[in-house]
């Protein structure tokens, strides 16, 4: 109860502090309601279209709510990462993957850049929010609901992992890009000397590349108004297949993992990077298995192992040491799917298509 009161107080303070603050993105102005979250050099705000920008529906002004992500980019590398994130929000045309509504790159007076990305606001919250509510209420998720959520998230991942699954959307993607590439006039000038990745600028090549999210967690699974699970926060998403060819690349990737991956859901191959190592989209299958486990039991598998046996989290992950609670209410078939995902050897994990088939068999 005390924590709920504190959260309410903080929200009221946030709302009061931002009551007159607005952010302009292209031709629309958004009034900040409160801070939703922050991390590193990025902030996410709950915003509302200002009066002059309200959407008119049947003659009625609709006060639309959005999530607005602000990314501060002090370096060439950070602007490159930010631009990749912008492209990610337009790349995957699936109801199970988040899409942006608008975006803009702004030049600041000190020479740095700031990226603004307008995203849908998911009022139903995240999968982690749902798990937390059940823990507080002492209720449990049914197997049928588990499978429904798992199927949706896996379908979203299939869109990232499998270029063939995006072919049906190739035509619509061109139209979406034509509309949504509405950056400010100065954007081209800002990015003249930025070493952007080639796949960011070529829709043709992007359609043939497999991508990995690399930070699938319950907090990054959102629920749409009709209850569909939606993969969110594509800031960590990039080309799936990577070969570590030199020590500089190894060092940079290690730093990236530390900054972008959530440890309880991070696969062992990302914690033990080596020269000549090949990384693939199978990193997401491990994270997905851990996320499914958390949905079912309210705690991630390796954090549970740490609590029960005192093993370090990293050691438990590297050895794949975890267990299921005794007398589980879930079927052996569903537990078997989790076991297949949480395999230390990536080769032993199913592909996204194989995982989808396993879940569909449970759904029949």
UniProtKB/Swiss-Prot annotation:
Positions that bind ATP: 36-44, 69
First-listed, main subcellular location of the protein, grouped into a coarse class: membrane
Superkingdom of this protein's organism: Eukaryota
One GO MF term: protein serine kinase activity
Disulfide bond entries: none
EC number: 2.7.11.1
This protein's name: Serine/threonine-protein kinase ENV7
Biological classification of the source: Eukaryota, Fungi, Dikarya, Ascomycota, Saccharomycotina
């Amino acid at each position: 109860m005390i924590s709920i009161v504190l959260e309410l107080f903080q929200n009221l303070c946030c709302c009061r502090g931002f009551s007159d603050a607005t952010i302009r993105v292209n031709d629309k102005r958004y009034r900040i309601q409160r801070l939703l979250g922050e991390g590193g050099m990025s902030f996410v705000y709950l915003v509302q279209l200002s009066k002059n920008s309200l959407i008119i529906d049947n003659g009625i002004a609709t006060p639309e709510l959005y999530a607005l992500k602000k990314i501060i980019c002090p370096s060439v590398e950070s602007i490159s990462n930010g631009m990749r994130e912008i492209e990610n929000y337009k790349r995957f045309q699936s109801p199970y993957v988040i899409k942006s509504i608008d975006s803009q790159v702004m030049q600041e007076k000190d020479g740095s850049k700031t990226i603004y990305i307008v995203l849908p606001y998911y009022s139903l919250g995240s999968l982690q929010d749902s798990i937390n509510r059940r823990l507080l209420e002492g209720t449990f998720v049914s197997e049928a609901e588990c499978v429904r959520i798992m199927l949706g998230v896996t379908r979203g991942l299939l869109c990232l992992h499998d270029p063939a699954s995006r072919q049906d959307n190739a035509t619509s993607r061109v139209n979406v890009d034509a509309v949504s590439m509405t950056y400010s006039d100065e954007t081209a000038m800002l990015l003249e000397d930025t070493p952007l990745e080639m796949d960011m600028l070529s829709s043709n090549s992007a359609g043939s590349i497999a991508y990995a999210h690399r930070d699938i967690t319950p907090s990054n699974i959102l629920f749409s108004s009709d209850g569909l699970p939606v993969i969110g926060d594509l800031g960590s998403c990039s080309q799936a297949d990577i070969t570590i060819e030199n020590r500089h690349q190894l060092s940079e990737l290690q730093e990236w993992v530390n900054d972008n991956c959530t440890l309880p859901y991070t696969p062992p191959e990302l914690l033990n990077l080596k020269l000549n190592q090949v990384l693939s989209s199978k990193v997401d299958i491990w994270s997905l298995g851990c996320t499914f486990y958390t949905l079912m039991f309210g705690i991630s598998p390796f954090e549970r192992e740490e609590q029960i046996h005192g093993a370090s989290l990293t050691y438990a992950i590297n050895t794949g040491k975890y267990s299921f609670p005794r007398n589980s209410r879930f079927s052996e078939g569903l537990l078997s799917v989790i076991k297949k995902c949480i395999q230390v050897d990536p080769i032993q994990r199913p592909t996204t298509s194989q995982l989808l088939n396993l879940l569909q068999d449970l759904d029949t």
